[in-house]
Amino acid sequence: MDRVTHFAVAAAKLAIEDAKLDMSKENPLRCGVCVGSGIGGIHTFLEQSLKLGSKGPSKISPFFIPMEIPNMSAGQIAIATGLKGPNTAIVTACATGTNCIGDALRTIQYGDADVMLAGGTEAAVSPIAIAGFANMKALSTNNENPEAASCPFDKKRDGFVMGEGAGVLVLEELEHAKARGAHIYAELAGFAMNCDAYHITAPDPTGETPAACIAAAVADAGVKPEEVDYINAHGTSTHRNDLGETIAFKKVFGEHAYELCISSNKSMIGHLLGAAGGVEAIATVMTIENDIIPPTINYKDKDLDDPEGPLDLDYVPNEARKKVVNVALSDNLGFGGHNASIVFKKYVD
């Protein structure tokens, strides 16, 4: 298995363990997987490409294709856990994890499964991926102070810092979860997705399309915009993303945007690309569970002078905050213009 699949299988097993899900008591045909990767097995791809150049095609591993393709993480999770229900892997760049969670939600709502493992995985910290992102000017160049290089919404932000890992949740139909006495962290209440149709990498500068996605997810959750307490933002620490997200939040929430708590996990763990949505969904759920909002660290200088609009919302700077959170939203944006948003609510029996 490629490193990306190792991450996925490990996260899936940990999720099952945490959920106390006994697969020997479940119908495997009613339990599925939706776990994707933005890039797939890039370590395998690089290794085999170098071997092709140095030793020729006869030396390429017969496992190259199965190890490289992005859907193999979902397949290997099923093999490792025995889940025989719906099995898919969505690829929408950095929106992958959120899209997978949303698709898993719909799978349960449509009645095609009772349990879904959902999220994203990525292992792209490799020379070729770093070079590619660096040459397109997406990465921070603050090499003198790397601990502070990821600084979402800060005036001095200059690009993201790459991270890697996997985040997988157990989504379960409510009555099924109650019947087995599962601990319910939160209710996944809403999902929406759309596309900017604007540029291969840059987000919609008007914020209109991501705003529409966020608004649709909030509506799907059956809540009013003013009921949202917290947003786990995409917050990549790039100029365009953080500005565009702020504009979108203001469009959706109006004056309530200034009462929202907004933070970016990427300030602490970097940008996990296709895994970002999975890990950030878990952080959002734990925010609701514990009523503690994670901070945006490395936030020092407010960006109030941008000609396209000030970044003047509450980004929960530098210290976690104790606050009751009943409704929270997590949003992610991906190259290609992909937008995806999910809404969680505090579960009340």
For the regions a protein language model found, what residue spans apply to each?
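Condensing-enzyme catalytic core mediating Claisen C-C bond formation in acyl metabolism
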Residues: 144-221, 229-230, 349
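Glycine/charged-rich beta-loop-alpha catalytic/anionic-binding loops adjacent to active sites
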Residues: 52-63, 80-90, 147-155, 195, ...
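Conserved small-residue
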Residues: 12, 33, 77, 97, ...
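Conserved beta-ketoacyl condensing-enzyme motif
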Residues: 1-92, 121-130, 225-241
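Active-site-proximal alpha-helical scaffold in enzymes
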Residues: 8-21, 70-74, 78-81, 86-122, ...
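A glycine- and small-aliphatic-rich helix-loop capping segment at beta-alpha/alpha-beta transitions
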Residues: 43-57, 107-110, 130-143, 205-208, ...
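Flexible, low-complexity linker/loop segments at domain and module junctions
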Residues: 27-28, 221-227, 258, 311-349
